[in-house]
Amino acid sequence: MKFFKKLAPAVALALCFGIGGCGDTSFSVKLGYNDGTLPNEDGTLFYREYDESLFYRNDLTLKKVADPSVIYVEEGEYAGKLFLYGTSNTLSVRGIGVWQSDDGVHWDSYGVAFEPETASWGYSSLWAPEVIYDGAGKYYMTYSARNSNTIAAGGKYYGNTYIGLAVSDSPAGPFVQWTGTNADGAEIGLGDPIFDPAKITAVDGVACEAGHYARYRFLDSSLFADGDELYMYFSRGKDRYNVLTPGADYAYGKETSEIWGVKMKDFSTPDYSTVTRLTKVGYNTVDGETEADYNDIDRERASADQINEAPQMYKRDGVYYLTYSVGGTTSNFYSVAQALGSSPLGPFTKLSKADGGLVLGTEMNWIQAAGTGHHSFTPIGDELFIFHHEGADRYTIDSENRAIAYDRAGMAENSKGQKVLAANGPTSYSLQPLPAAISGYKNIAPEAEVSVSGLKEGSDKKWLTDGFFASHLTGVVGETEFDAGTTAEISLRWKEYRTVGALLLYNSIDYDKTFYRIARISLSVRTASGATGTAVADNAAFPFDETTNYSSQQLMFAGSNLVLDFNDIEVNGITITFRAPRSEGSVAVGDICVLGK
């Protein structure tokens, strides 16, 4: 961790902790803080130093890695550590790499987690690993690989892409390919993938033909434990150069990939009788045939490749959330979407963008993120996060140019009353709070009583402390709007004093509704000696330079915020006062985060 000076050099901390003259029961002093806007020593504005004990920033430091699977280890030798597994260009996709991190930003390579033996069926093109812990000391990795080995299994699977299984006693690896007798009594050797593709395709009556350019591909697998039951999800893709007569579901000359699922008898044995198709590209359901069942996210983000891929399952309060990536893998609009169901194998119904279907994605003219897809939902303590890859240069994306980022996620409610997954991002240059399990500080704003003045008619103060900020103009996350030309005030009050170390005030995603500065932020504080009073920050300016796409002037960067980072203070109230500068319209606040204990 870098040493970071929390107090801006131009402002002295004057909260009178143990300083003479603070015996008064009431006082008002200037709050000393760092807002992260001081230039670096070389004068540059981006990637400035910051307090790494409280915040993180997606600096995209882990490059040439894609398709991340991330787990947070809660016990044992690596308790409190994050492990990431991914498709690795540096390994020439002949092995799966593993990296370890304390904060999700700074990653140390632990080398090769898994490299198949030369006799293995899956000897090349190792992609998209997913790791799950069984709770009993074993870590299981599923992965995709292409069988370029003509010797393995007599060349039975040569040229095709299938799913393999590896196992380890440690999250750091090494993983070894699983071999042995599965639950059906079949002997699985190095030359066999854990699924027999002939049995998988036979379920819907379509035979899998051999040959490099005439095949179905099985990839992007993930395991999901639902109580004592285990399920496997995967993408079944039809190659863009497929010479088979395309069916009605597929566009000739284009790659199509859709989500399928199967119940597992154990980690190595699929129950082939349960293989189920879960999505249909372009439609809300697998039975969709008419325009009325079009899915706007699939169609809005379609490219030359028409895909639903990289599935993950999440369950909350009896609802199953099938999340997956849409758009082409090299498209700037590669995004994460969701469908809802009442059982692990569906049926599932995709959500529209207005109903929260877009979990994570970019918009037209964004210059700070591209291709934010192939995700991993990772619980860290009591919070949920979404890891994903994106273009390493932030403008474009291709198979040689990807990096890892992450953002907060959680449950929001759409206008139909459905609880849906939502993500705070994709964020780029702005600071975000570290996971509470890592920093020891959580967002206590939702625990405060909130009052406001200057609220625009029809707006709602609930968006101020719901834990979400809007990343798109359309979606399930709203903003609190205030009348233009007025002085607005937001007040947060706690029933008792809380230890507070930082305040983040999120701006509107809509360029036309942004605030430029905050006239006053006043904290009701208590000193160590018991004196009470206020600590005040005046004219705190919002950092427009690294949060705005000036060329389009339509959308702000997702997660743009004003940050006040200060030494811990005992606080029981915060009042935020600002003047909406415009003569018409409104000014919006996306969210308020107070990092405290």
Residue ranges with predicted function:
Residues 234, 388, 574-578:
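Extracellular beta-strand-rich recognition modules
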Residues 1-8:
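Bacterial N-terminal signal peptides that target proteins for export
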